Amino acid sequence: VKGTAREVKKMLLKMVACCCSLLLLAGFLSGCNVISDPISLMQTPTMSDEKQQLNGAVNTQLGAVQPLRPNDPDDPTPIRTGDLNNDGIDEAVLFYETPDESVKIHGALFEDQGGTWVKKLTFDGEGTVLESFKLVDLTNDGTLDIVAGFSSGDSSENGDQKGLIVYSYTGGTLEKIYATGYTDFVVDDFNHKKMDLNGDNLNDLTIILLRRNEFFTVKTFQFSGGTFKEIGSLELDSQALGVYNVVAGKVAQGRQGIIIDTKIAETTTVSNVIVMDHGKLRKLNLMDVTFKDATIASGDVDGDGILEFGNLEKPKGWSNRPLDEVPYFVSFYQWDGAKGTIFKQQQYRDSNEQVYFRLPKELHGKVTIDPKVSRKDSYLRFILDDTDKTIAEIKFFSLSQWERNNEGYSQLWRTNAQVIGIKRSSELEPRKTIKNKMGERQVE
């Protein structure tokens, strides 16, 4: 972008003013969720002096390498710091590409020596893509271990072979203490806290491995006597097409578990809820609520610290309509810790998941989408099914329609082709929550 400093400043002020206007408009929404967080996008990241020194040390001592960001949406940070050998001094770890060498990815470990970062060693990675990168105490000795996942980068069916390596740093040397193939793995919960399936207060490592039409296994390990020992194993349906989401943490009050969202047909998925009872892994028998014709990611949707799994719910009055015309609700449930489930939240999502419209919990089972006038991804009238009273309307506008007459709707989401707007009634208290694929922002 070219221009004088004054012009740039003027342009930025206009952009901030525009974004603030959008957020003020969002303040009138009722639990409506959009894929837009302009303020967070506009914030200029600031780098601490320590990070600047570390980046400078990396450039000086490794050459002009670019630290690799792992393909992990939860934490793509390229350089991790922590005390890896329990000496009270932080180390820093990163991975970088070495395309002209036989080993295409290498790692480097730096040590903070009196405020100066000094490279202590480099080490081999695997594959050509850094999939995941964590510092976790898997050896349960009070020191952090390096846990890294690599792949070949082959996206063809059954082609991408992933490999997990656990490294331990002791006595000034780095040792590879475990290596295995994986489809996904779990070493911490969704809050990046200890994962402890068997309740012995020690960290676990769980490996999920799917080889289609051959096997689909879940195995949990703990480090003991200098090696990782299997403490639980479970076989799932090997006919599954793939795993599209894995999340771990509390699955009920006082119970930790893992939810493996799995695609089992072109449009059909199931959420496998895995817990450990009496030293054995088991899958909960919840097929009536975890089997669905949609790709819905499990997670803590209501922020209570316990994981939920989702399912489709057809609004009343739509039973005779073709399936592709039905504007389904997405309902989320928790395991009750015994043999049943607890309803937690209901949402409407458009087909492209641009807008999440969250209905108040107390209205569950009392709201439908008027089948007489509503059309999916065009116009939706949300009504109380006993009185026919309108509580909300969502409408899709072309840009020209919106500019010409927005009909009193508030903007939820805008692209270069359309605007999605909403009207709401007093039944929907203005909680003013914006939730989207890029995070959540509370607007007071």
Each language-model region and where it sits:
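N-terminal secretory signal peptides that target proteins for export/translocation
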Residues: 1-11
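Charge-rich, low-complexity amphipathic helices
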Residues: 5, 380-386
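Sec-dependent N-terminal signal peptides of Gram-positive bacterial secreted proteins and lipoproteins
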Residues: 11-37
